[in-house]
């Protein structure tokens, strides 16, 4: 009987493996053959790595790259001039598609239905969306019923047959199925939440629906607002790309970081909110920081550090021979500040201390009276580890699976008081002797 049960179990396990393999094969067959270049914004036109990568993915020298100025306001066509130069210096034959809300002599809705213009984009091997307001891109490329226009269908054809779709800032936000549309600062999102059709809206969905895209992520502390949107829409994973940095995604799965800084990977698949709290809270978020050269499989979420880090220092806080560089407690008064979260993650994985605290609040609101804020508690777990190298000329970390709990707090106000000269303080404060005699 035991042998029979074992045989049945083994057969079931084998069937499950075969079924999973077949499902993966079907997904691979249906997946677009092209690549995405998701740029966090503020890219430098003289840094060749990004532009060389876009052109290479579009087919190399002579690649036809269609540039969409749609997100820009003011002078969208003029804005594209430096971009055209950067791509053409890298070998492309790029052109600007006149789908814009100003500076062109035709209506946007007319342009996206123009057969000649649509065919020119369809024949391209790459598409590039510039920055601005992502709502302008979506409003142009979806019709009144929120269905794909002929122009968007042509863009999808470029992607499916092996071309590249690149976008910076607003052009990065549209990559996911859900995007921020016109969002206030991160602290305001933490306090007030998000509503579909207002702060968040439909993106164009080039990336898998389980992934949310955030841009200008580290410089502007936007990882916090991304967590609110992800939790609201039940999106388990997020990609936060920093400025002058890109995540290159091939065939929708294999992704590599290029550029100046890094990418934050947000995982709320096991996170829970406190149902007793009206304010936003989340427990057991996982954060990983990927630096230039690091790769991640978006399907399995397996991370491969850059070769320079694999050949240098591995940091395993749970190993018996763990010898961290830092030995101090960490408290960040503005965790939403410029690159604060990336700095914290690097120092926490390489520290004798196993947790760190960050606060998010408005100093202006708290100057005179109490105000609402949030505590971010970062802590290592059994799965936390990292790598370190100085090969790039600085302190570069790759950090995996730092845990995070967010909970609302009350900041006592006034936040501070001015000190008085000692003589004035003595005059205003009765001496102990005087108090006793009275």
What are these model-derived regions, one by one?
Residues 1-7:
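Bacterial N-terminal signal peptides
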Residues 14-61, 72-81, 87-90, 101, ...:
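C-terminal and late-domain segments of enzyme folds
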Residues 66-70:
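Short internal beta-strands
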Residues 72, 79-82, 90-118:
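Functional beta-strand-loop-alpha-helix junction segments that form "active/interaction loops"
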Residues 116, 120, 147-162:
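Catalytic-core regions built around general acid/base machinery
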Residues 134-148:
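Glycine/threonine-rich flexible loop motifs
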């Amino acid at each position: 009987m035991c042998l029979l049960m074992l045989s049945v179990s083994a057969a079931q396990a084998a069937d499950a493996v075969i079924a999973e393999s077949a499902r993966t094969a079907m997904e691979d067959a249906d997946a677009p053959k092209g690549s995405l270049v998701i740029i966090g914004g503020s890219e430098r036109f003289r840094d060749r790595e990004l532009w060389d990568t876009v052109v290479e993915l579009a087919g190399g020298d002579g690649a036809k790259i269609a540039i969409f100025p749609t997100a820009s306001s003011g002078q969208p066509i003029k804005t594209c001039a430096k971009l055209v130069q950067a791509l053409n210096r890298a070998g492309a034959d790029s052109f600007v598609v006149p789908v814009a809300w100003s500076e062109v002599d035709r209506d946007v809705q007319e342009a996206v239905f123009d057969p000649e213009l649509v065919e020119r984009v369809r024949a391209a091997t790459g598409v590039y969306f510039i920055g601005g307001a992502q709502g302008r891109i979506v409003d142009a490329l979806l019709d009144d019923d929120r269905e794909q226009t002929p122009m968007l269908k042509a863009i999808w054809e470029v992607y499916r047959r092996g071309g590249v779709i690149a976008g910076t800032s607003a052009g990065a936000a549209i990559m996911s199925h859900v995007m921020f549309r016109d969002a206030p600062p991160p602290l305001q999102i933490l306090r007030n939440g998000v509503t579909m059709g207002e702060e968040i809206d439909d993106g164009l969905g080039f990336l898998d629906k389980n992934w949310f895209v955030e841009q200008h992520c580290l410089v502007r502390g936007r990882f916090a607002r991304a967590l609110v949107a992800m939790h609201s829409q039940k999106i388990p994973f997020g990609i936060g790309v920093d400025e002058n940095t890109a995540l290159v995604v091939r065939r929708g799965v294999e992704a590599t970081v290029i550029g100046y800084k890094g990418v934050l990977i947000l995982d709320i698949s096991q996170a829970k909110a406190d149902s007793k709290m009206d304010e936003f809270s989340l427990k057991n978020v996982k954060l990983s920081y990927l630096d230039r050269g690091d790769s991640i499989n978006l399907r399995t979420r397996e991370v491969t550090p850059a070769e320079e880090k694999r050949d240098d220092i591995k940091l395993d806080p749970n190993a018996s021979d763990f010898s961290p560089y830092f030995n101090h407690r960490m408290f960040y008064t503005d965790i939403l500040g410029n690159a604060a979260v990336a700095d914290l993650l690097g120092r926490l994985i390489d520290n004798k201390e196993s947790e760190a605290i960050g606060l998010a609040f408005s100093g202006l609101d708290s100057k005179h009276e109490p105000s609402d804020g949030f505590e971010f508690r970062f802590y290592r777990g059994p799965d936390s580890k990292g790598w370190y190298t100085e090969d790039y000329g600085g302190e570069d970390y790759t950090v995996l699976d730092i845990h995070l709990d967010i909970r609302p707090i009350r900041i006592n106000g006034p936040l501070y008081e001015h000190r008085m000269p000692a003589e004035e303080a003595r005059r205003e404060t009765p001496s102990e002797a005087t108090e006793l005699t009275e």
